[in-house]
């Protein structure tokens, strides 16, 4: 049998939603938007690294 601890009692509410699934699509569209924004961010960083984009007064010297 599992031993009850004070830390376990504190953390129990965080685990109360385990196994429950939101109906429908839930927050999937929000995740998709953030993934797209992250992709744009990575593309901008890559283009700066390749010097495809030159920003005035920003020197890239690596």
Swiss-Prot record:
Q: Name one GO cellular component term.
A: photosystem II
Give GO terms for biological process: photosynthesis; protein stabilization
List keywords of the entry alphabetically. Membrane, Photosynthesis, Photosystem II, Thylakoid, Transmembrane, Transmembrane helix
Bilayer-crossing residues are 29-49
Q: Name one Pfam family in it.
A: PsbH
Q: What topology in the membrane does the UniProt record assign?
A: Single-pass membrane protein
Example GO molecular function: phosphate ion binding
Q: Where in the cell is it found?
A: Cellular thylakoid membrane
| Stated family | Belongs to the PsbH family.
Subunit organization: PSII is composed of 1 copy each of membrane proteins PsbA, PsbB, PsbC, PsbD, PsbE, PsbF, PsbH, PsbI, PsbJ, PsbK, PsbL, PsbM, PsbT, PsbX, PsbY, PsbZ, Psb30/Ycf12, peripheral proteins PsbO, CyanoQ (PsbQ), PsbU, PsbV and a large number of cofactors. It forms dimeric complexes.
Q: What does this protein do?
A: One of the components of the core complex of photosystem II (PSII), required for its stability and/or assembly. PSII is a light-driven water:plastoquinone oxidoreductase that uses light energy to abstract electrons from H(2)O, generating O(2) and a proton gradient subsequently used for ATP formation. It consists of a core antenna complex that captures photons, and an electron transfer chain that converts photonic excitation into a charge separation.
Name assigned to this protein: Photosystem II reaction center protein H
Gene behind this protein: psbH
